[in-house]
Amino acid sequence: MASKMSLRYSLFLIFFSLISLQGFAKKTGDVSELQIGVKFKPKTCEVQAHKGDTIKVHYRGKLTDGTVFDSSFERGDPFEFKLGSGQVIKGWDQGLLGACVGEKRKLKIPAKLGYGEQGSPPTIPGGATLIFDTELIAVNEKPAGGEEYGGDEDDEGYGNDEL
């Protein structure tokens, strides 16, 4: 009798622990797939980013707890790289494809498309989901030239309540 109760109690604890862990992962903001949210888009898209293009991007990188680990906005110096060439983390190569010059995106990047299980010590822990607020400044040296539409900067723009 005591062993049956002990077994039931153990099963209850295991079940409760699994439920708690699932809730904790969701609360921390971790994601398993790349999530792209368009925060702002120009009225017309004159220049769009494609694989092989050299792009300039302003960004702010954060952990899911809100800790900022890097920001070109604060430095006043956008980052330049060749899109799709592996010069940056995979989440950037995938998350900025198709963006228009002047477009602002929020990228939620899972560890597998970021710095993986090893992280990038000391600022980025292993297994970290990364959040980047990005603004595409130029594609192949072509800056924005079109009119911007009056989007709401505070609007998440995801179309997905999970973000």
Curated annotation (Swiss-Prot):
Reaction(s) catalysed by this chain, per the record, are:
[protein]-peptidylproline (omega=180) = [protein]-peptidylproline (omega=0)
Composition-biased stretches, type Acidic residues, lie in 149-163
Question: Which stretches make up the PPIase FKBP-type domain?
Answer: 52-140
Signal sequence segment = 1-25
Outline the segment boundaries, as ranges, of region: Disordered.
142-163
Record's subcellular location: Endoplasmic reticulum lumen
Gene Ontology terms: biological process: chaperone-mediated protein folding; response to endoplasmic reticulum stress; response to fungus
Q: Which top EC class is named for this enzyme in its record?
A: isomerase
- What InterPro entries does the annotation carry? FKBP2/11, PPIase_dom_sf, PPIase_FKBP_dom
Task: Give an example GO molecular function.
Answer: peptidyl-prolyl cis-trans isomerase activity
Q: Which domain of life is it from?
A: Eukaryota
Protein EC: 5.2.1.8
Among the entry's GO cellular component annotations, what is one? plant-type vacuole
Locus of motif Prevents secretion from ER: 160-163
Record's keyword terms, sorted: Endoplasmic reticulum, Isomerase, Rotamase, Signal
* UniProt similarity note: Belongs to the FKBP-type PPIase family.
Q: Fetch the PANTHER family from UniProt.
A: PEPTIDYL-PROLYL CIS-TRANS ISOMERASE FKBP15-2, PEPTIDYLPROLYL ISOMERASE
Q: What does this protein do?
A: PPIases accelerate the folding of proteins. It catalyzes the cis-trans isomerization of proline imidic peptide bonds in oligopeptides.
* Descriptive protein name: Peptidyl-prolyl cis-trans isomerase FKBP15-2
Q: Which organism is it from?
A: Arabidopsis thaliana
What gene does this protein come from? Answer: FKBP15-2
